[in-house]
Amino acid sequence: MGSVRTNRYSIVSSEEDGMKLATLAVANGFGNGKSKVHTRQQCRSRFVKKDGHCNVQFINVGEKGQRYLADIFTTCVDIRWRWMLVIFCLAFVLSWLFFGCVFWLIALLHGDLDASKESKACVSEVNSFTAAFLFSIETQTTIGYGFRCVTDECPIAVFMVVFQSIVGCIIDAFIIGAVMAKMAKPKKRNETLVFSHNAVIAMRDGKLCLMWRVGNLRKSHLVEAHVRAQLLKSRITSEGEYIPLDQIDINVGFDSGIDRIFLVSPITIVHEIDEDSPLYDLSKQDIDNADFEIVVILEGMVEATAMTTQCRSSYLANEILWGHRYEPVLFEEKHYYKVDYSRFHKTYEVPNTPLCSARDLAEKKYILSNANSFCYENEVALTSKEEDDSENGVPESTSTDTPPDIDLHNQASVPLEPRPLRRESEI
């Protein structure tokens, strides 16, 4: 859409660009109107990167420095460690220099810098700026070597010693609080929370479902863990307003409560593609030509600190594998369950997965194959794949190639020979 905008206030830059927009169906933002364009669009820039960082840059922010300084504690917690250490070192050094200058001025005005003067000094043994600076360090850090000390000759010197002690305590408290807050941030907890590299679409309980997998690499639990997802897609409203990133909620069981998960072993999050889903009208070919991004979010409290953490990732349209399922990772042993994370990102192709949209499937425009034959074909596919990998020594792949001449609405299923069948969970 960016190619048809010449300035920030116009949508159509010329008559030719207007004709281009007229060929697009903008009713729901996915190009599912009467005129469809099945050319693969240029891969969009991610709004949320795979590691969870948002791909956003702020420009032309008014009074940015003042706003950040007004919230200096959050600024210190958010910045990198090296800048944090630089700021804290400067805070100490500048405070020592400031009070060193104050004590040097007191000594200068009182005449303590004159070695021939025999009167009582405000600060004993402070007869130069270096001595005043060392006295400032000893006062703020409570070192107290004993050579330099304040006397009762000058009340202003006594007041400055008390004031510097208070300032030193405030700086220490601020630094300790900021360091502890930065160390306790649950941001690093996200390093042990992982999402699958690809999302998949396959049949589950007779319905097309969008699925992705999430896992916890630590044995410590994520308390009150729950998931949510949004679909980001640019669209044009019926009034002609261009929305670069329209956010549409994807239901993962919020109403029924199944969005709350017990994340001990890897779990597959399921979004049922029903009439309320933004993917309801999309077939495999539509998704192959679509330009959208699905942002997935996992939230919960870290068990050790009780602080809330949020882990994010995203899937572009070309990262959604149609007709695939995830390989099993949880296996039951004699006295425990074993999780094999080497299979976490691997998928296998499911035969006879409908290539039509969920709407066409609901309206009976697609003939589903027998469920038993599905289980048998699935078993054969997995068995042959494992045999080939063991013979050739080739790692398992997640091929997404599909025969090009398959009809989206009428796929014939070849009847299989009678064989003893096994459940899919036993494969």
UniProtKB/Swiss-Prot annotation:
Entry keyword annotation includes Transmembrane: yes
Regulation: Activated by phosphatidylinositol 4,5 biphosphate (PtdIns(4,5)P2).
Record GO biological process: cardiac muscle cell action potential involved in contraction; magnesium ion transport; potassium ion import across plasma membrane; potassium ion transport; protein homotetramerization; regulation of heart rate by cardiac conduction; regulation of membrane repolarization; regulation of monoatomic ion transmembrane transport
Motif Selectivity filter: chain residues: 142-147
Ranges for region Disordered: 384-427
Cytoplasmic side, ranges: 1-81, 179-427
UniProt-listed PANTHER family: INWARD RECTIFIER POTASSIUM CHANNEL, INWARD RECTIFIER POTASSIUM CHANNEL 2
Name of this protein: Inward rectifier potassium channel 2
Organism: Sus scrofa (Pig)
